[in-house]
Amino acid sequence: MFRKLAAECFGTFWLVFGGCGSAVLAAGFPELGIGFAGVALAFGLTVLTMAFAVGHISGGHFNPAVTIGLWAGGRFPAKEVVGYVIAQVVGGIVAAALLYLIASGKTGFDAAASGFASNGYGEHSPGGYSMLSALVVELVLSAGFLLVIHGATDKFAPAGFAPIAIGLALTLIHLISIPVTNTSVNPARSTAVAIFQGGWALEQLWFFWVVPIVGGIIGGLIYRTLLEKRN
């Protein structure tokens, strides 16, 4: 079990460090930097690379909504859920702490003012989208993400391609929703940066736990009841 938890911790660390790091350090440097598309690709690449690296150890969840969604889909034991979620949150926070340290080396850096890659809705949405818009996009994309994960890891799916499908799915999710919520679909990712933003991000953090998890459960149940092939 320790190896599984370590894999989840390292994997989530990589996701936050690579994905949020690209948003904090590279998205707007210089001027446009890598932009939304670059950040979306970075998030997808973090999952793809770590799924190949440690997926065989822990399953490569790196996301509480994925862990709970896989449990809802009958793919993951309930007794391991809490340990996985704790490991994911710890890994994300460590990554965010290192990003904060790096970003603080630039004169004028202010995590609270910049948002520090935090997720938000309403006045804190990158595009000014409402709470309802954020609810719909996070719910639909979290459910869709779990459908992709269940399908790509199904025993009847082509072997060896799951990390590619899942990484590309996460890239697509970010391309769609960065303007709406700055893209969560992952409570551990949201928590990690919200701690260092320290203001509105913490006030809205509950939303980015509840909605992705509910969406993940919906996706897991849809695949389990409607799509999974029975022997």
UniProtKB/Swiss-Prot annotation:
Motif (NPA 1): 63-65
Pfam families cross-referenced by the UniProt entry: MIP (PF00230)
Sample GO molecular function, one term: water channel activity
Compartments where located: Cell inner membrane
Keyword set, alphabetical order: Cell inner membrane, Cell membrane, Membrane, Repeat, Transmembrane, Transmembrane helix, Transport
Site entry (Selectivity filter), positions: 43, 174, 183, 189
Membrane topology annotation: Multi-pass membrane protein
GO cellular component, one term: plasma membrane
Keyword Transferase: no
Domain of life: Bacteria
Location of the motif NPA 2: 186-188
Reactions mediated catalytically: H2O(in) = H2O(out)
Site residues by UniProt (Involved in tetramerization or stability of the tetramer): 20
Residue ranges of the TM segments: 9-29, 34-54, 82-102, 129-149, 156-176, 202-222
InterPro entries per record: Aquaporin-like, Aquaporin_transptr, Aquaporin_Z, MIP, MIP_CS
Annotated family: Belongs to the MIP/aquaporin (TC 1.A.8) family.
Protein role: Channel that permits osmotically driven movement of water in both directions. It is involved in the osmoregulation and in the maintenance of cell turgor during volume expansion in rapidly growing cells. It mediates rapid entry or exit of water in response to abrupt changes in osmolarity.
Subunit and interaction comment: Homotetramer.
Record comment regarding domains: Aquaporins contain two tandem repeats each containing three membrane-spanning domains and a pore-forming loop with the signature motif Asn-Pro-Ala (NPA).
Protein name stated in the entry: Aquaporin Z
Organism: Escherichia coli O157:H7
Gene of this entry: aqpZ
